[in-house]
């Protein structure tokens, strides 16, 4: 089942978002500006596009794995969420996590990837307890934040 995504190129000199390989989940987003990020610095970077995410779907903006691994470039609010009703320009909140080296982003560089996925939109129902709602205790209960172990420091 194929879904189409309406894309407006706000900057006609930049290419449409592209998939590097047939079957890739994400499409690459391009920087619409030149930016230099000092170590630890963040910036909201324009992509020059706007999209119309279909109702019942969500756009998720993820870091590009090669940039994260090689130069420490990531996304502050990863993944960034694009709701179906948003029609403005996609901007990416990038951060340089390298402790020593600045990251230079040139206009036209691929800086992130956009995934579009179906999303459940549940009705929120207030309950006074999970037992009352028929959602009895689980083996995990309220354990979180390292409660399952898996690392020597935990």
UniProtKB/Swiss-Prot annotation:
Record: residues binding substrate: 64-66, 77, 81-83, 91
Reactions that this protein is recorded to catalyse: dUTP + H2O = dUMP + diphosphate + H(+)
Residue ranges of the region described as Disordered: 135-154
Cystine pairings recorded for this chain: none
GO molecular function, one term: dUTP diphosphatase activity
Pathway listed: Pyrimidine metabolism; dUMP biosynthesis; dUMP from dCTP (dUTP route): step 2/2
Biased composition annotated in UniProt, kind: Gly residues: 144-154
Keywords assigned: Hydrolase, Magnesium, Metal-binding, Nucleotide metabolism
Keyword Chloroplast: no
EC top class, as a word: hydrolase
GO biological process, one term: dUTP catabolic process
Gene3D superfamilies referenced in this protein's UniProt entry, alphabetically: 2.70.40.10
EC id: 3.6.1.23
Pfam families associated with the record: dUTPase (PF00692)
Cofactor(s), by name: Mg(2+)
Subunit (UniProt): Homotrimer.
More about this protein: Each trimer binds three substrate molecules. The ligands are bound between subunits, and for each substrate molecule, residues from adjacent subunits contribute to the binding interactions.
Family, similarity comment: Belongs to the dUTPase family.
Physiological role: This enzyme is involved in nucleotide metabolism: it produces dUMP, the immediate precursor of thymidine nucleotides and it decreases the intracellular concentration of dUTP so that uracil cannot be incorporated into DNA.
The protein, known as: Deoxyuridine 5'-triphosphate nucleotidohydrolase
Source organism (scientific name): Mycolicibacterium smegmatis (strain ATCC 700084 / mc(2)155) (Mycobacterium smegmatis)
